[in-house]
Amino acid sequence: MNRNVIRLITRGCLILAAILLTGVATSCAHRLYARMQPDGWSAQPIVNACRFTQDADLDSATGTPVGDEGYYLYILTEAAKWDFSDAKSILISIWMHPYGHSWIILESPDDRMEFGQTGNIGKKKPRYHEGAMKRLDDEHPNPIAYLWETMPDGKLQIGKPDRPPTFVWRMPITRLKYQLIYEHVMNRKYDEFDLRTNNCTDMAAEVAALASVNLIHRIRLTLPPETEVWFLRQRIWKDTKYRILEFSTPEVLEVDLRQLAQFGIGSDYTEWYLTLTR
């Protein structure tokens, strides 16, 4: 199968993934998309233009990733079930389930290592949802601006986190890609955690890109200037630079990984992992 045919197949997969992410064909994905509403709210997953990078190691017949025997990359997600259907729903769902997580496993014939990016633990600064809610209470003109803050408490997670994933995806990689990813993980800076540009899902997506797969993992929110919070009308922003918020989230990443597994790009290893950790 030549590269043009593979490109057409992967482009079709991306289009189908975009349809599924906007809620036409899955029961859970509708929470990730909301068309522009009268109050100014909208939510839209950000879809990549190309699924594989130029140096991807693909099977010539199927167009799916291949690797060396015993070398694998796993991406794990813990989706917090955030509801992006409207401004009120997202605020309530974040308050009820403020944390999600994404992390990785690197496997070779001799070893299996688990890594992730952590932060936003609330010791040096209030956590994102706490800081934003505090600014709402204080009638700050731009309470949502707290989500633009950088947390100084980031660190490298080594080993299993203290909560199980909701999905585990595995893909084969070459020994060369394994070494490239390992060096990236070991040399990456973790001391800062940023919701918009440097969170746990960003780290997982970076690693996937080194394995030559571009994952759909970001969402774009258009925020209304005001919304109802706890039965009170509250200002969200006054300065228009806070109208658009883009960030990576396990919810979007997990939907994409599930679709990839259905397309035959990688595999669902959730049960394997949960059995392994019992």
Name each model feature, range by range.
Residues 29-61, 179-278:
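Activation targets extended, charge/polar-rich intrinsically disordered C-terminal tails
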